[in-house]
């Protein structure tokens, strides 16, 4: 079984602990005067509440057909409109410049290289209207703890094992079923560098809009297109 197939059926369990982000992205969407786009929309965990709160459709993009099927079902159940598209965020293109593009639940970490992320950020910038916003979150990982965590098995939220590869900034996540995925962490300066090349301006960070500190465990960025 592939990661996409397995994960689409376990996503609600996997994401159960992440709820604080929904109100954050909903609030941004309410203040967006124009199209709203979610990258890595998954099963609509965030897009459905955003569409419900704003009364407007959300354009949702994901590479996983299995996750998009779940999103369609969840949108029908909630009686909201999602415009779902199977595609890669690195190739983002919209017919009308967006007022808000957001990428929740650390999904940008699935992009393995600087070039992949730079391309995505440039496509986001090209897809935003002047003054449009780009928001996303990613964990702030302390790589010095990686050796002590390598190979650890966790039962929650879904039974899995983590392997850490510091030289590659990579974490391999393998479910007990054998399905595997990888994420690549980035530092604060790497994120800020991506904003610079895409000519996006950081407004603030944190789900409570607090500033970044050395103790932050989650990066939450909101940037504005100049």
Where are these regions (language model features)?
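Conserved class I S-adenosyl-L-methionine
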Residues: 1-34
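Class I SAM-dependent methyltransferase "Motif I" SAM/SAH-binding loop
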Residues: 40-43
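Class I SAM-dependent methyltransferase SAM/SAH-binding core
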Residues: 47-91
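A short acidic, Gly/Pro-enriched loop at the edge of an enzyme's catalytic core
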Residues: 93-100
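A conserved beta-strand element that flanks and buttresses the S-adenosyl-L-methionine
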Residues: 102-104
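A short glycine-rich, Lys/Arg-flanked "PGG" loop and its adjoining helix->strand segment in the class I
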Residues: 118-130
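SAM-dependent methyltransferase
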Residues: 135-193
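C-terminal lobe and adjacent flexible extensions of AdoMet/dcAdoMet transferase-like proteins
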Residues: 188-226
């Amino acid at each position: 079984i592939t990661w996409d197939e397995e994960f689409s059926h376990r996503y609600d369990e996997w994401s159960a602990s992440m709820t604080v982000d929904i109100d954050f992205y909903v609030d941004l969407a309410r203040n967006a005067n124009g199209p709203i786009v979610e990258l890595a929309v998954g099963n609509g965990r965030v897009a459905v509440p955003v569409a419900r709160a704003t009364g407007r459709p959300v354009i949702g993009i994901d590479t996983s057909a299995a996750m998009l099927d779940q999103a369609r079902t969840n949108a029908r159940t909630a009686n909201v409109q999602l415009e779902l598209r199977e595609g890669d965020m690195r190739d983002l293109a919209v017919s009308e410049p967006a007022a808000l593009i957001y990428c929740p639940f650390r999904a940008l970490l699935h992009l393995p290289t600087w070039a992949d992320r730079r391309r995505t950020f440039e496509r986001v910038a090209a897809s935003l209207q002047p003054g449009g916003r780009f928001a996303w979150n990613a964990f702030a990982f302390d790589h010095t703890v990686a050796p002590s965590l390598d190979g650890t098995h966790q039962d929650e939220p879904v039974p899995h094992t983590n392997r850490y590869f510091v030289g590659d900034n990579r974490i391999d996540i393998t479910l007990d079923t054998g399905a595997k995925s990888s994420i690549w962490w980035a530092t604060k300066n790497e994120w800020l560098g991506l904003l610079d090349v895409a000519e996006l301006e950081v407004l603030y960070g944190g789900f409570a809009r607090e500033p970044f500190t050395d103790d932050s465990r989650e990066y939450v960025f909101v940037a504005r297109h100049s």
